[in-house]
From Swiss-Prot:
InterPro entries: StAR, StAR-like, START-like_dom_sf, START_lipid-bd_dom. GO terms for cellular component: mitochondrion. Plays a key role in steroid hormone synthesis by enhancing the metabolism of cholesterol into pregnenolone. Mediates the transfer of cholesterol from the outer mitochondrial membrane to the inner mitochondrial membrane where it is cleaved to pregnenolone. Gene3D superfamilies: 3.30.530.20. This is Steroidogenic acute regulatory protein, mitochondrial.
Length: 285
């Protein structure tokens, strides 16, 4: 009931929200996001009310923040929706089937989700603190092509606020040309929830990055990585990666399943090697 009431009020005051300055918009958006989170079984009211209050306390001193455009607000909302959908998929523990399990404990699971298709879930433990993974996967995102052979290049096309970016990713061809050149345009959203960090995203449209000649524009479905300190061993990190991709084109399902499952296993191995060879961001590897 509370969520429905807020949505009704928000819809009737949309023009008023658009006239607000940046932080005012963020405060209103935060309330909507947290109400959605509560509807999905999120934290108690006191926690998110304090977060909104902290944002609101900055309004008086930063009223000159630029407005977000309608398109930027749409990207922010799309990133939030991708995160909520991906976390909802991970939250449901029923129906997952084992695809592979490595000697080091790395495990890939899969599940068919209505309106999404087959998704893959990687579960690994990395012998590095969470902050180090955050540096590599978020702050140095554009350097991923240096250490992940499955990625030729990632570029940040636009940054919106502190949590949302639009990216273009050019994937490497799979050995034997089983899967030809693909690229992805995605909206990505990064959030911290207590000791947990969530990196989420999905396909989006971006006029300044049209489809490239000779490259198939594939699409990420709701996808995310969840990072959290390993219980009882905070210097290590539990990484969960939900992968949902529509590769487009005509490809047998057996090949798609094999490629995506192996992509996750390879990613974990390459990430570990990167972290071992470049233990800190300051090293400027």
């Amino acid at each position: 009931m509370l969520l429905a009431t807020f949505k009704l009020c928000a819809g009737s005051s949309y023009r008023h929200v658009r006239s607000m300055k940046g932080l005012q918009q963020q405060a209103v958006l935060a309330i909507g996001q947290e109400l959605n989170r509560r509807a999905l079984g999120g934290p108690a009211p006191a926690a998110w009310i304090n977060q909104v209050r902290r944002r609101g306390s900055l309004l008086g001193s930063q009223l000159e923040d630029p407005l977000y455009s309608d398109q930027e607000l749409a990207y922010i909302q799309q990133g939030e929706e991708a995160m909520q959908r991906a976390l909802g998929i991970l939250k449901d523990q029923e129906g997952w089937k084992k695809e592979s399990r490595q000697a080091n404990g790395d495990e890939v699971l899969s599940k068919v989700i209505p309106d999404v298709g087959k998704v893959f879930r990687l579960e690994v433990v990395v012998d590095q603190p969470m902050e180090r993974l955050y540096e590599e996967l978020v702050e140095r995102m554009e350097a991923m092509g240096e250490w992940n052979p499955n990625v030729k290049e990632i570029k940040v096309l636009q940054k919106i606020g502190k949590d949302t970016v639009i990216t273009h990713e050019l994937a490497a061809e799979v050995a034997g040309n089983l899967v030809g050149p693909r690229d992805f345009v995605s909206v990505r959203c990064t959030k911290r929830r207590g000791s947990m960090c969530v990196l989420a995203g999905m396909a989006t449209l971006y006029e300044e990055m049209p489809q490239q000649k000779g490259v198939i524009r594939a699409e990420h479905g709701p996808t995310c990585m969840v990072l959290r300190p390993l219980a009882g061993s905070p210097s290590r990190t539990k990484l969960t990666w939900l992968l949902s991709i529509d590769l487009k084109g005509w490809l047998p399902k057996t090949i798609i399943n094999q490629v995506l499952s192996q992509t996750q296993v390879d990613f974990a191995n390459h990430l570990r090697k990167r972290l071992e060879s470049c233990p800190a961001l300051e090293a400027r590897c």
